[in-house]
C-alpha cells in the first residue's frame, strides 16, 4: 500500500478573508501563510501547492508592537551606485500600506517556485472593500 498524493484536480481550494484591523502583523502573516501553504488541511504535502486563496482587508490598520513603527526599515536597491533606498514602516504605511502585509506574508512562504505559486493566491487591500465577493470567502479571525 503506497501513500496517495493529491492531484491538481483533487485539490479543493477555498477563499478566506482576514480583517487586519487591530491585528498584530506577525500573527496575521503566520496565519495567512499557513493557509496559503495548505498546512491547515489533512492532505498537506510539502511539494504540492494545496493551499487556499487569502484576501486581507484593512491592511492600512494593521497593528505593530513596540517601536517598529519608527525602527523597522524596508530596503530595496535601485541598481545604481549608492541606490539603496531605506524607508521606515511609518513612511511605507503612508505610501503603500499593502506592502507591509505582503512583505510579512511573503517572508513566511518558501523561497522557491512553489512559494511564488502560493504567493499568487494572496490578495491584499488597504480598505475594507474587495472585489472577491463572488467567490464567497469565509471570514477568519486571528487571535
UniProtKB/Swiss-Prot annotation:
Single GO biological process annotation from the record: negative regulation of translation
Domain of life, source organism: Bacteria
Keyword terms, alphabetized: Ribonucleoprotein, Ribosomal protein
Alphabetized GO MF terms: mRNA binding; structural constituent of ribosome
Any Gene Ontology CC annotation: cytosolic large ribosomal subunit
Record Pfam families: Ribosomal_L13
Claim: Nucleotide-binding is one of the keywords in the record: no
Family, similarity comment: Belongs to the universal ribosomal protein uL13 family.
HAMAP family in the cross-refs: Ribosomal_uL13
Its biological purpose: This protein is one of the early assembly proteins of the 50S ribosomal subunit, although it is not seen to bind rRNA by itself. It is important during the early stages of 50S assembly.
Subunit structure: Part of the 50S ribosomal subunit.
Name the UniProt record assigns to this protein: Large ribosomal subunit protein uL13
Native organism: Solibacter usitatus (strain Ellin6076)
Gene: rplM
Amino acid at each position: 500500500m503506497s501513500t496517495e498524493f493529491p492531484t491538481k484536480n483533487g485539490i479543493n481550494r477555498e477563499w478566506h478573508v482576514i480583517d487586519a484591523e487591530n491585528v498584530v502583523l506577525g500573527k496575521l502573516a503566520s496565519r495567512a501563510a499557513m493557509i496559503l501553504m495548505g498546512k491547515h488541511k489533512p492532505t498537506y504535502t510539502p511539494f504540492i501547492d494545496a493551499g487556499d486563496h487569502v484576501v486581507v482587508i484593512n491592511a492600512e490598520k494593521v497593528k505593530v508592537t513596540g517601536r517598529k513603527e519608527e525602527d523597522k526599515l524596508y530596503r530595496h536597491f535601485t541598481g545604481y551606485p549608492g541606490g539603496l533606498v531605506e524607508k521606515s514602516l511609518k513612511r511605507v504605511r503612508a505610501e503603500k500600506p499593502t506592502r507591509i502585509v505582503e512583505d510579512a506574508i511573503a517572508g513566511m512562504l518558501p523561497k522557491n517556485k512553489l512559494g511564488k505559486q502560493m504567493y499568487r493566491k494572496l490578495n491584499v487591500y488597504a480598505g475594507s472593500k474587495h472585489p472577491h465577493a463572488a467567490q464567497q470567502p469565509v471570514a477568519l479571525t486571528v487571535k
